[in-house]
UniProtKB/Swiss-Prot annotation:
<keyword id="KW-0249">Electron transport</keyword>
<dbReference type="Pfam" id="PF04800">
    <property type="entry name" value="NDUS4"/>
</dbReference>
<dbReference type="GO" id="GO:0006120">
    <property type="term" value="P:mitochondrial electron transport, NADH to ubiquinone"/>
</dbReference>
<dbReference type="GO" id="GO:0005743">
    <property type="term" value="C:mitochondrial inner membrane"/>
</dbReference>
<feature type="region of interest" description="Disordered">
    <location>
        <begin position="151"/>
        <end position="175"/>
    </location>
</feature>
<keyword id="KW-1274">Primary mitochondrial disease</keyword>
<keyword id="KW-0496">Mitochondrion</keyword>
<dbReference type="GO" id="GO:0001932">
    <property type="term" value="P:regulation of protein phosphorylation"/>
</dbReference>
<protein>
    <recommendedName>
        <fullName>NADH dehydrogenase [ubiquinone] iron-sulfur protein 4, mitochondrial</fullName>
    </recommendedName>
</protein>
<keyword id="KW-0472">Membrane</keyword>
<dbReference type="GO" id="GO:0009060">
    <property type="term" value="P:aerobic respiration"/>
</dbReference>
<keyword id="KW-0225">Disease variant</keyword>
<comment type="similarity">
    <text>Belongs to the complex I NDUFS4 subunit family.</text>
</comment>
<comment type="function">
    <text>Accessory subunit of the mitochondrial membrane respiratory chain NADH dehydrogenase (Complex I), that is believed not to be involved in catalysis. Complex I functions in the transfer of electrons from NADH to the respiratory chain. The immediate electron acceptor for the enzyme is believed to be ubiquinone.</text>
</comment>
<keyword id="KW-0809">Transit peptide</keyword>
<keyword id="KW-0813">Transport</keyword>
<keyword id="KW-0679">Respiratory chain</keyword>
Length: 175
């Protein structure tokens, strides 16, 4: 009942706004296509809830996740920026901070010979936009962490004329 009456009220509101917008647009001679798009976006913005739920205190979620407590409480994580891929010249993947967990016990699977582990978090890598976000997430979950600072490469000064200098070993004679 409430959903039906809400949609009727929303529909009436949109028709009223459209009538007002059509009256305003007929004077300024703007195409009606932009009117429909803007009215639809306005209706979308009204229906979406932009409230965020924040929890200030640390909650114990070990019973909800199903992960054993020894895997959650005694973790050590590494926070770092990944190195640039040597196969490409771009630096797009070096903008985010990554968090990966320490390696726990592993063993060789006797059937297939694969490396096995009982740790559900060992292969998980989390991505953060800033180092502070990663540190606060680790502190919120009670994990100890190591931070590897971003390595900024020093640019080497090169000149085109150095390729043709006679006192360097850049030219190889054939004799």
């Amino acid at each position: 009942m409430a959903a039906v009456s809400m949609s009727v009220v929303l529909r009436q509101t949109l028709w009223r706004r459209r009538a007002v917008a059509v009256a305003a647009l007929s004077v300024s001679r703007v195409p009606t296509r932009s009117l429909r798009t803007s009215t639809w976006r306005l209706a979308q913005d009204q229906t979406q809830d932009t409230q965020l739920i924040t929890v200030d205190e640390k909650l114990d979620i070990t019973t909800l996740t199903g992960v054993p407590e020894e895997h959650i409480k005694t973790r050590k994580v590494r926070i770092f920026v990944p190195a640039r891929n040597n196969m490409q010249s771009g630096v797009n993947n070096t903008k985010k901070w990554k968090m990966e967990f320490d390696t726990r016990e592993r063993w060789e699977n006797p059937l297939m010979g694969w490396a096995s582990t009982a740790d559900p978090l060992s292969n998980m890598v989390l991505t953060f936009s800033t180092k502070e976000d990663a540190v606060s997430f680790a502190e919120k979950n009670g994990w100890s962490y190591d931070i590897e600072e971003r390595k900024v490469p020093k640019p080497k000064s090169k000149s085109y004329g150095a390729n043709f200098s006679w006192n360097k070993r850049t030219r190889v004679s054939t004799k």
